[in-house]
């Protein structure tokens, strides 16, 4: 088997483009949701980068960022599912590069408890990206011949669930909200809902083509992504409250010491 499935991918794209949709809006409305999602997620990434520079910490877990940027490279430039999607993926990739830079700048502060990681973070990121790129290319070459364009959904949405739960774990393990913000969450959450609406629309109006997104696995990915975003908000409130209590305690002790 070849490591690339370019011919099979081209055939899958032709099949999608040449298959008449049951309703005129089945392709255009989801494209609108995709564009909205792309803009919101880009804003979220930009806010993450700004917060990383400001707080000298970061919100996006490293393994998620490595998975994200390499996925965007694979489906933005190797297996493109259409111009609009490719533009969105390329846009995310550019912002991810800025986010990587912000993370590297914050490394001495974010990883001060582990100088070894701080000193070698650039190398860790490079190795992580190489492994993730290999993973995405291997998955594409293996599954495109059998499921075609479905591979985009089947690989993108698990990463969304992973990002949410990893961000929750990050908040709890750090015990603070440095690098995180409500603006990051709102734009990310609304972007995820817009992307989910894209598939809800397709599932309802074109189940013959997009029914795979409402299989038990598809339901887990779509509902799990939205649900875990809600859990993140609750955890953020909890950690923020603890932060305020600790700050208040420190201030009280400082006043007594005077």
Curated annotation (Swiss-Prot):
Family: Belongs to the paxB family.
Chief location: membrane
One Gene Ontology cellular component: membrane
Function according to Swiss-Prot or TrEMBL: Terpene cyclase; part of the gene cluster that mediates the biosynthesis of macrophorins, isoprenoid epoxycyclohexenones containing cyclized drimane moieties. The first step of the pathway is the synthesis of 6-methylsalicylic acid (6-MSA) by the polyketide synthase macA. 6-MSA is then converted to m-cresol by the decarboxylase macB. The cytochrome P450 monooxygenase macC then catalyzes the oxidation of m-cresol to toluquinol.
Organism: Penicillium terrestre
One MF annotation (Gene Ontology) recorded for this entry: lyase activity
One Gene Ontology term from the biological process aspect of the record: terpenoid biosynthetic process
The protein's name: Terpene cyclase macJ
Keywords tagged on the record: Lyase, Membrane, Transmembrane, Transmembrane helix
Pfam families hit by this protein: Pyr4-TMTC
Changes seen on gene knockout: Abolishes completely the production of macrophorin A, 4'-oxomacrophorin A, 4'-oxomacrophorin D and 4'-oxomacrophorin E; and leads to the accumulation of yanuthone E, 7-deacetoxyyanuthone A, and 22-deacetylyanuthone A.
Transmembrane segments: 29-49, 58-78, 83-103, 124-144, 151-171, 181-201, 220-240
InterPro entries: PaxB-like
Extra information: The macrophorins cluster contains a single gene insertion (encoding for the terpene cyclase macJ) compared with the yanuthone cluster that produces the linear compound yanuthone.
Keyword Signal assigned: no
Gene: macJ
Membrane topology: Multi-pass membrane protein
EC number: 4.2.3.-
Pathway assigned to this chain's UniProt record: Secondary metabolite biosynthesis; terpenoid biosynthesis
Location(s) in or outside the cell: Membrane
Impact when changing residue 31 to A: Does not affect cyclase activity
Statement: the UniProt record of this protein carries the keyword Transmembrane: yes
